[in-house]
Amino acid sequence: MEQYRGTTIVSVRRGNNVVIGGDGQVSLGNTVMKGNARKVRRLFHGKVIAGFAGGTADAFTLFERFEAQLEKHQGHLVRAAVELAKDWRTDRALRRLEALLAVADKESSLIITGNGDVIEPEKDGLIAIGSGGPFAQSAATALLDNTDLPARDIVAKALTIAGDICIYTNHNHTFEELDG
C-alpha cells in the first residue's frame, strides 16, 4: 500500500508503557494547509490510543468505525481491528478511504490498512507510518537498541528526526500514552 503524504505517526512500547505520537502538518499538494492538526486520539473510554496517516476526513470516518467495533467487542483490540479491516475491504464506501491506522492498547500494537491487513509489529511495538515513517522507524530502532530512554522520549526524538528530513512532516507533535 502507498505511504500517504502529509504526516508521520510513531508508536513505541517500552516496559509497561506505550506511546503514539504524530506531527501536525496537513498538506494539500505542495502547500501546507494546517500545522497543528491532531492526528492522535484516545478511543474506547481512554483505553485505546490511535493515530492516522492519510486523508483527514477518511481517518475520522475510520476512527468512528473502529470505535464502534471496539464497543461491539468490549474493547478487544485485535478482534475490533480484524472486523474493521474486513469492513474496510468489503464495504464499497469504505474501500475508497485512503488512510492507515496505528492503534494500541495495554497489550497490543497494530497497523490497520485499507487492504484488509492487520499487522502486528515485529519488535518493541514499533510502528511508523506516513511519509516520514521510514525515517522515524530508523531513528526509533536505533534509540530502542542503544539507549534506555522512555517510550515517549523515543517517539518525540523519532518524530523530530522525521520532521527534519520529510517535507510533509512538521515539529508540532501530539502524544497519547498508556501505562500498564
Curated annotation (Swiss-Prot):
- Catalysed reaction, written as an equation: ATP-dependent cleavage of peptide bonds with broad specificity
EC annotation from Swiss-Prot or TrEMBL: 3.4.25.2
Which InterPro entries does this UniProt record tie to the protein? ATP-dep_Prtase_HsIV_su, Ntn_hydrolases_N, Proteasome_sua/b, Proteasome_suB-type
One GO BP on record is: proteolysis involved in protein catabolic process
Tell me, what controls this protein's activity?
Allosterically activated by HslU binding.
Please tell me where Na(+) binds in this chain: 163, 166, 169
Q: Where in the cell is it found?
A: Cytoplasm
A cellular component term from Gene Ontology for this protein is: proteasome core complex
Keyword Ribosomal protein among UniProt keywords: no
Task: Write out the catalytic residues in the record.
Answer: 7
Principal location listed in the UniProt entry: cytoplasm
Q: Which UniProt keywords apply?
A: Allosteric enzyme, Cytoplasm, Hydrolase, Metal-binding, Protease, Sodium, Stress response, Threonine protease
* GO molecular function per UniProt: metal ion binding; threonine-type endopeptidase activity
- What top-level branch of life does the organism fall under? Bacteria
Query: How is the quaternary structure described?
Result: A double ring-shaped homohexamer of HslV is capped on each side by a ring-shaped HslU homohexamer. The assembly of the HslU/HslV complex is dependent on binding of ATP.
Known role: Protease subunit of a proteasome-like degradation complex believed to be a general protein degrading machinery.
Which HAMAP family does the entry link to? Answer: HslV
Report the sequence similarity comment from the record: Belongs to the peptidase T1B family. HslV subfamily.
**Protein name as catalogued:** ATP-dependent protease subunit HslV
- According to its UniProt entry, this protein's organism is Alcanivorax borkumensis (strain ATCC 700651 / DSM 11573 / NCIMB 13689 / SK2)
